[in-house]
């Protein structure tokens, strides 16, 4: 929804799982409009969703998410229009646990703590300019920014004290962060030289920044009152990996006659990262024949290339 250019209206909905808000209307009547929407789970406003506790222990859990979407649409003329958009979404989960025990006179105490936090989310911003050259040709020019982030941290601690002096203690904490950030610019043309031909062509540039992982951990161990270990480990990949991708494409949807149509196209791309370049040519061809009475026969050939892959390990 790009926003109503004539009047203001909106809605606020309280649901069992999510609450929603939507507002839209004109900024400059018949020229500029806006649209804003937001969604959240009600647990966003609670510190803890589930609490289980008694005199010696407590377990606390919570999960929430939210996302917001804002758009502005401006009409310069009947041939020129610009669209601006912003999106942000985030999910969060946390768990906290605590246990403690002591003897009858509190001279001996034992307690343990455990907590973990997991966050992930996306941020997207883009602007698109639509320009109509004539009745046969128009163009969309788009600039965008996309960022994904994930973070995980947690710690655990077990402590045993006698007469308020620590005899045994084990502490472990860890943090992990990763993310992907893309900047891109593209131009897409739509050309109809005659009724039988519908041609699309364009170009795109993407700058990738990958942060595969930044991990740190700390271990502290006390045994019989003596420090056995106090170490910080850093397995960070502090150097971001960058890649640049350039691509060109063209395709033609050709209606040969009332029953037979062809779609032929090609995409060529170049990916450069860490001093190396990778090139690919990706042709495609499809044909469709209308058999009548709602039936058709189709055949196609496509060659595609993917430069970035997700590698994951599966425990046996």
Describe the role of every protein-language-model region:
Residues 1-2, 8-59, 64-75, 83-87:
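Predominantly transmembrane beta-strands of Gram-negative outer membrane beta-barrel pores used
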Residues 73-91, 116-274:
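Face-selective signature of the C-terminal outer-membrane beta-barrel domain
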Residues 6-17, 38-41, 261-272, 281, ...:
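Transmembrane beta-strand segments that form the barrel wall of outer-membrane beta-barrel proteins
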Residues 32, 80, 197-199, 285, ...:
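Short, well-structured beta-strand segments within conserved domains
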Residues 51-56, 89, 98-112, 156-170, ...:
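Flexible, surface-exposed loop regions and adjacent strand-edge segments
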Residues 10-14, 34-38, 84-86, 141-143, ...:
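Membrane-embedded beta-strand positions of outer-membrane beta-barrel proteins
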Residues 18-20, 33, 65-69, 122-126, ...:
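Transmembrane beta-barrel architecture of outer membranes
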Residues 92, 103, 149, 289, ...:
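Surface-exposed extracellular loop regions of Gram-negative outer-membrane beta-barrel proteins
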